[in-house]
A protein has these predicted regions:
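N-terminal amphipathic/hydrophobic targeting modules at extreme N-termini
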Residues: 3-6, 12-13
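Short hydrophobic alpha-helical segments enriched in small aliphatic residues
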Residues: 8, 21, 36, 43-44
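Low-complexity, intrinsically disordered segments with a bias for serine/threonine
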Residues: 8-9, 33, 39, 355-356
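N-terminal start and proteolytic maturation junction detector
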Residues: 9, 25-26
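N-terminal polybasic/positive-inside topogenic patches
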Residues: 13-19, 41
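Alpha-helical transmembrane segments of multi-pass small-molecule/ion transporters
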Residues: 41-358
C-alpha cells in the first residue's frame, strides 16, 4: 500500500512537471506576443493622448494669430457666431440630464456675484473711462464656459456642481443682459422697451433654446441624442473656429479706427487680467466655505469668452471686446498654472507613496 501510494505521488509530480513544461514552452510565446500587442496599443493610446493635448494647447494661440493676421477674411464669417454658440451649447447641454441638475445655495451666491458684481465694477470704472468699464463689465457678466466642467474634473473638483452652475449662469445672463445692455452702449439711444425687446429677441433664444432643445431631444428622440453625444468633441473645433472669427472681427475694427486710443486698449487688457485673477480667487474663497473650492473658482473665473466678445461687439462699444479677447489668454494661463500645480502635487504624492512601500 505504501509503495502504491508513493508511486502515485511520484506519478502526480511527473505529470505536474510535464504540464508545467508544456505550458512554459507553448504559451509564453503567444502570451508574449499578446502582451506586446497590448503594451503597444497602450503606448500608442498614451502617445495619441499626449499628442492631442499638445495640439489643443497650440490651438488657442494659433486661432488668435490666424484671426489677427487674416482678419479681413475671417471677419466676414462673424454672422455665423450665434449659430456656432447655439450649436456648442446644444452639444454641451446634451450631456446634462435633468436629474443631474441640483441647485444649491452656493449657486445663488455665485450668480449674484456674477450679475451684481458686473454692475458694481461698471459703475466704479465708468467714473474714469466708459469703454474700459464696458470691457470690465462683460468680463464679469459673461456666463461660465462650457469647458469649465472638464477643467474642474481635471483639478479634482465637483463636476456635477459646476455643470449645474453652467446652466444657472447661462439662464442668469439671458435674463439680466437685455435689461443691463439697454442702459449702456448704442442701445441707450432707443426707448427702453424697444431696446429690451430687441436684445431679448437675440440673446435669450441663444442661451435658453439650446437647453430646451437638448432636453427635448433627450426625451423625444433618444437615437438623435446618442448621435449628438458621439459628435460632442466637435465643440472644441467650433470653439477654435469661433475664436478665430471673433479675433478677426476685433482686429478689423481696431485696425480701421480713425483715431485709435491705445491707452484704452492697454487698460482693457490690464483690467481683464485683474478681473480674471479676482474672479478665480473670489470663487475659491466663497466656495471653500461650502466645500466646493475648485468648482466655485472655475464657475466664476472660467468664462464663455466667445459669447462675451460677441455680445460686446453687438451691444457695447466694439473696442470693449478687447477686454474679453484678453481674458481668453489670461484664463488659459491661470488654468495651465492650476493644472501644472495639480500635476506636481500628484507626482509628489506618488513618489512619497512609492518611497513608503520600499
Amino acid at each position: 500500500m505504501q509503495n502504491s501510494s508513493l508511486f502515485e505521488v511520484m506519478l502526480r509530480r511527473v505529470l505536474i512537471m510535464q504540464i508545467y513544461e508544456t505550458i512554459r514552452e507553448t504559451i509564453p510565446s503567444g502570451a508574449l506576443e499578446l502582451s506586446a500587442i497590448v503594451v503597444t496599443l497602450h503606448d500608442a493610446k498614451k502617445r495619441r493622448k499626449k499628442m492631442m493635448q499638445s495640439i489643443r494647447s497650440c490651438v488657442l494661440p494659433l486661432a488668435m494669430l490666424t484671426g489677427g493676421v487674416f482678419y479681413g477674411f475671417f471677419s466676414r464669417f462673424s454672422t455665423a457666431i450665434p449659430y456656432f454658440i447655439f450649436t456648442m451649447l446644444l452639444l454641451t447641454f446634451c450631456k446634462l440630464a435633468p436629474k443631474d441638475v441640483k441647485f444649491k445655495k452656493l449657486h445663488l451666491w455665485l450668480i449674484l456675484i456674477q450679475i451684481l458684481g458686473s454692475i458694481a465694477v461698471y459703475l466704479i470704472v465708468s467714473l474714469f473711462d466708459t469703454v474700459t468699464a464696458q470691457g470690465a463689465f462683460i468680463c464679469i457678466l459673461a456666463p461660465t464656459a462650457m469647458a469649465a466642467a472638464v477643467i474642474t474634473g481635471m483639478l479634482g473638483g465637483n463636476v456635477a456642481f459646476l455643470t449645474s452652475y453652467v446652466l444657472v449662469s447661462n439662464i442668469g445672463t439671458a435674463l439680466a443682459a437685455p435689461v443691463i445692455f439697454s442702459f449702456m452702449g448704442p442701445n441707450t439711444e432707443m426707448p427702453f422697451t424697444d431696446s429690451f425687446i430687441y436684445i431679448c429677441r437675440e440673446v435669450m433664444p441663444l442661451l435658453i433654446l439650446p437647453l430646451l432643445a437638448a432636453w427635448t431631444i433627450r426625451a423625444a428622440a433618444p437615437p438623435l441624442h446618442r448621435a449628438l453625444l458621439k459628435i460632442n468633441p466637435v465643440t472644441f473645433y467650433l470653439w477654435a473656429f469661433s475664436l478665430t472669427i471673433v479675433t478677426g472681427r476685433t482686429v478689423k475694427f481696431l485696425s480701421e479706427q480713425q483715431n485709435p486710443d491705445y491707452t484704452t486698449e492697454i487698460s482693457l487688457a490690464a483690467i481683464a487680467l485683474a478681473i480674471c485673477l479676482a474672479q478665480f480667487k473670489a470663487g475659491k474663497y466663497i466656495g471653500n466655505r461650502y466645500g466646493e473650492r475648485i468648482a466655485a473658482g472655475q464657475g466664476l473665473g472660467q468664462k464663455n469668452t466667445i459669447l462675451a466678445i460677441w455680445m460686446s461687439q453687438m451691444y457695447l462699444n466694439p473696442v470693449a471686446s478687447v477686454g474679453p479677447a484678453s481674458y481668453v489668454l489670461w484664463q488659459n494661463i491661470v488654468n495651465s498654472y492650476q493644472l501644472w500645480i495639480k500635476k506636481n502635487r500628484d507626482d509628489k504624492c506618488a513618489s512619497s507613496h512609492e518611497a513608503r512601500k520600499k
